[in-house]
Amino acid sequence: MSWPLDRKNKSRICNRGPKPCGYWGSTFRFRVALLVWLAMSIAAVPLSAQLVRGSMDVHWNAGAENCKAAPQPPIQVHRYETQTFILRQNLCVSYEGNFLYLLIGDQRALLIDDGAVSDPTEMPVARTVLDLLPIRGDSRIPLLVVHTHGHTDHRDGDPQFASLPNVQVAPFDLKGVREFFGFSAWPNSMAHIDLGERVIDVIPAPGHHQAHVLFYDNRTGLLFTGDFFLPGRLLVEDTAADKQSAARVIEFVKTRQVSRVLGAHIELDENGETFAFGSHYHPHEHSLELTTDDLFTLPAALNAFNGFYTRYGNLSLMNQNRMLAVQAILALVILTFIVWSVRRLWRRRRRKRTAVPVNV
């Protein structure tokens, strides 16, 4: 069978209508290509569009110059979203001003760090956290308490949780951390915590502390960095380990949508200057949240780190142990000089007193 010709355009006419014969085939292919493109576009929608968004519209308590004259609540609670809470310990109770993070899943909840104060009368961490947990049946959902690392200001609240029902406190030493989370190849593997429809990734990041870990929440895109990365002094105990951790964390971040980077302290003012060690008053603080762009500057800062103290952009890196050792040596040198000067002066005076006058 031959198709009739369009005498004017010299093209064959299909029986489906006055269109060139190739029209219907090309239209079908176009529609298929369009559907494939739409499917690929939907699949390629950034994960950030699927994240649960929260609010950081909060003004953190700045402490006080005179805490006795200005008593304040020991804990400030901010609801980031319905199942995520940020708690800050008041600077007047502890100059560390720790941030704690409560993440609630369908089956259990996770508390990241429990702060710098063990006395529940001064800092009622356990009571505050339990009051935020939802009730399932006749009791509140189980709670798991973990630590970004083992420094005391991140685990001194452990005793408040130790004897509570439906509460488990994770270990903080290196051996305990590796076994509890089930890392297959520390520090080059990850672990996961399933809270029920909410999975938390656990990323090893030794350097500040040998058992330091970060937590990434797949629900909100929040990355909790503890003392590894924060708006303040980055205390580096092991530079080589910290460099390797920074590289691993950045590679991890490139595969995830990170909405905010949240550390454990604020030690900078809004101009990027550090508050004095031990200060109970932080007026005009830097924001708690950092970005992945901030995080991406860490490798260069670590490469520039001289092992003692380095300022790199807004980052202040220091090895606290070495700085304390240098200060101790300087103090010893100064004390030695003072003692030597006093003894020398005393000997001069003694020689003058005992000198025999010469008769001419």
What residue spans do the PLM features occupy?
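Short, intrinsically disordered terminal tails adjacent to the first/last structured region
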Residues: M1-K10, K352-V360
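Short, low-complexity intrinsically disordered segments enriched in A/P/G/S/L with frequent Arg
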Residues: S2-L5, S11, R16, P20-C21, ...
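Bacterial N-terminal signal peptides
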Residues: A33-A44
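Accessory terminal helices/loops
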Residues: Q50-A69, A247-V360
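Conserved beta-strand hairpin/beta-sheet module of binuclear metal-dependent hydrolase folds
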Residues: P74-I135, F215-D227
